Regions:
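Acidic, surface-exposed loops and disordered segments
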Residues: 1-186
Length: 186
């Protein structure tokens, strides 16, 4: 099997990480892969904030948990009631992906970059988990203050995040795939 397809098929959402931080060479390679993602009209209106500071990661997770408690979605509230709940699964690295609020198609561009991050990580035997609930970090009156503290450019909005770390668990088995989702017009 082709190596690229093998990596795609092996990648899983990992939710248990070793405490050891990802090496600089590896995180730089992963982030370079993100920048090689396609973007509409090659506009590249994305920004990647790589958070590895343990105190900042704890602060982010705690803020998200508190904001989830105010959610109208019962499942989110139930998870957040657990004081040990960490939306990032205690990963030692989290990438926040943001994009220019005025640019077009950035959700798609950032989605492609997110997949590149996940696939590059898997190719290096590093676990990843794409996490949308990190958006609750910016669901408070302190959103602008948090963005500034994280170095997120003004006028950029949260799109998605990716937790990264050395796997402390084997990849889960492949879940069944719905095969009735493709039609060919020839």
């Amino acid at each position: 099997m082709n190596e690229t397809i093998k990596v795609i098929k092996n990648r899983r959402s990992i939710r248990k990480y070793k405490a050891e931080q990802i090496g600089d060479t590896e995180i730089h390679a992963i982030m370079e892969a993100a920048m090689y993602a396609p973007s509409a009209m090659n506009q590249q209106k994305w920004h990647f904030t790589v958070v590895q500071n343990p105190k900042m990661l704890d602060k982010m997770a705690d803020t998200i948990r508190k904001n989830l408690l105010k959610s109208s979605i019962d499942l989110f509230v139930e998870r957040a009631k657990n004081p040990d709940y960490n939306v990032f699964f205690n990963a030692p690295t989290v990438v926040l992906i943001t994009a220019d609020e005025k640019a077009h198609f950035t959700e798609f561009d950032c989605g492609a970059a997110t997949e590149n991050i996940a696939l590059a990580a898997e190719s290096l035997n590093i676990g990843s988990c794409v996490i949308g609930m990190a958006g609750f970090l910016f669901e408070s009156e302190k959103a602008d203050e948090i963005k500034k503290e994280l170095g997120i450019p003004e006028g950029y909005k949260f799109i998605i995040s990716v937790a990264l770390g050395y796997k402390d668990v084997k990849n889960p088995p492949v879940p069944p795939k719905n095969k009735d989702v493709i039609n060919y017009v020839r």
